[in-house]
Each structure stands twice: as structure tokens, then as C-alpha cells.
Swiss-Prot record:
Gene: ruvA
Species classification: Bacteria, Pseudomonadati, Nitrospirota, Thermodesulfovibrionia, Thermodesulfovibrionales
Species whose genome carries this gene: Thermodesulfovibrio yellowstonii (strain ATCC 51303 / DSM 11347 / YP87)
Biological process according to GO: DNA recombination; DNA repair; SOS response
Spans annotated as Flexible linker: 139
Protein name: Holliday junction branch migration complex subunit RuvA
CDD domains: UBA_RuvA_C
Family of this protein: Belongs to the RuvA family.
Length: 190
């Protein structure tokens, strides 16, 4: 129903923001780790998920549409409501959660408050099936860096492992390559 809201941020709290657009202030619940990227009195765009309940209407917001899509997949899982899904995304970012699922790391999922071993297993089971469609959304820059590391003689698995640990879309290619080479050179020396 609401794909995104673009407007001026009026209030920033750890778990919610108020964003004003068209003379209306929308209260939007966000993952706690997202609040550090949003500043008061700045224009921003938040991708949203509208949850209509019998007693309330809630808006959940995310900086990326892919994180919103993951939130919507999480709330489809039996026993995971919007509050638990936002709690999961407050603890782990999207890529970290994908890696946890990919490695079937029940221990890391169980560290999230409110998630026990059975719920963690259910999350792994449900999301593992859709992981290929949600897979890490690496862009052209990631592919170019991986290609450069392969051209320098590193093995694909080794280069990909290092790159997956340090890749950040906000860093420039040269910085990521330098950091990757530093780590890979350290492995060769062992």
C-alpha cells in the first residue's frame, strides 16, 4: 500500500522516526541500528511496510527496499510478528542475516532476544528456501573487485570469502582491494 515515504525527519528515536510530508507527520518504526544513519531536519526516503491490525495501523521503515522485503518475508514465518522481525533486523543487518542463514548458524540467531533454538530453526528452514531470490545483492563494483583479485592469482573461494567479510558499497574500489590484499597477503604468510 505504501512503498516509501519521502520527507523531512522531525524526530529521531532509537526505534522510530517521525517523517513529515504533505503536512502530515508519519510515525515510522525502524530497526534500532538504522537510527544512526538518519538525522533530524534532513530530507530522507524510507521504504515502508504497512501493517494493519485490528486495533492499530503501524508503519515500519527501512533505508533499503531489500531490507523491507526481508522484513516482509520474516513476518510470514509462524511465530514471527512485526516486533520480532524488527528486533531481528535491529540485531543483524540484511547481509549478515543472509550469511547466518547460508551457514545455518542457529547459535547466532538464538542470540537475538526472544528467539530460542526452535524459532531459530524455523527461521532457517523458511528463509533458506527463498535465499536464492533474496541472495546478497552484490553490484557491479563487487564483481569488478572479485575479478581483480582473481586476475592477481587468488583463488575464487579465498577471494570471495575475504571480500564477503569486508565488502561495503560505501567504500571505493581501491580501498576494498587494498584491504582485501592485506588480508590475503596475511593468509599467504601463515
Amino acid at each position: 500500500m505504501l512503498d516509501f515515504i519521502k520527507g523531512k525527519v522531525i524526530t529521531v528515536k532509537p526505534d522510530k522516526i517521525v517523517i513529515q510530508t504533505g503536512g502530515i507527520g508519519y510515525s515510522v518504526k525502524i530497526p534500532i541500528r538504522v537510527s544512526r544513519y538518519i538525522n533530524r531536519d534532513e530530507e530522507t526516503q524510507i521504504f515502508t511496510s504497512l501493517i494493519v491490525k485490528e486495533e492499530s495501523i503501524e508503519i515500519y521503515g527501512f533505508l533499503e527496499s531489500s531490507e523491507r522485503d526481508l522484513f516482509e518475508e520474516l513476518i510470514k514465518i509462524a511465530g514471527i510478528g512485526p516486533k520480532m522481525a524488527i528486533n531481528i533486523l535491529s540485531t543483524y543487518d540484511r547481509e549478515t542475516l543472509y550469511k547466518i542463514i547460508d551457514h545455518e548458524d542457529i547459535k547466532s540467531l538464538s542470540k537475538i532476544p526472544g528467539i530460542g533454538k526452535k524459532t531459530a530453526q524455523r527461521i532457517l528452514l523458511e528463509l533458506r528456501g527463498i535465499l536464492p531470490s533474496l541472495q546478497y545483492e552484490k553490484d557491479q563494483k563487487y564483481d569488478d573487485i572479485l575479478s581483480a583479485l582473481l586476475n592477481l592469482g587468488y583463488k575464487r573461494l579465498e577471494a570471495k570469502e575475504v571480500l564477503d567479510k569486508i565488502y561495503n558499497n560505501e567504500k571505493d574500489e581501491a580501498t576494498i582491494i587494498r584491504e582485501s590484499l592485506s588480508i590475503l597477503a596475511g593468509k599467504d604468510g601463515k
